[in-house]
Amino acid sequence: MEKYCELIRKRYAEIASGDLGYVPDALGCVLKVLNEMAADDTLSEAVREKAAYAAANLLVSDYVNE
């Protein structure tokens, strides 16, 4: 957990304690957020490219349900 930012560690603790809901389809959750980021014209092109690359890489390597 040390390599992740403070906000991620905070949300992790909230989920682990039951204060925040757990999403069983974690890969689907990640892909949904990355897709939203990649499509968001208000974000910088660099951030959108990072989100698109991460989502595409995840689809190729780990998310073979479709």
UniProtKB/Swiss-Prot annotation:
Belongs to the UPF0253 family. This is UPF0253 protein YaeP.
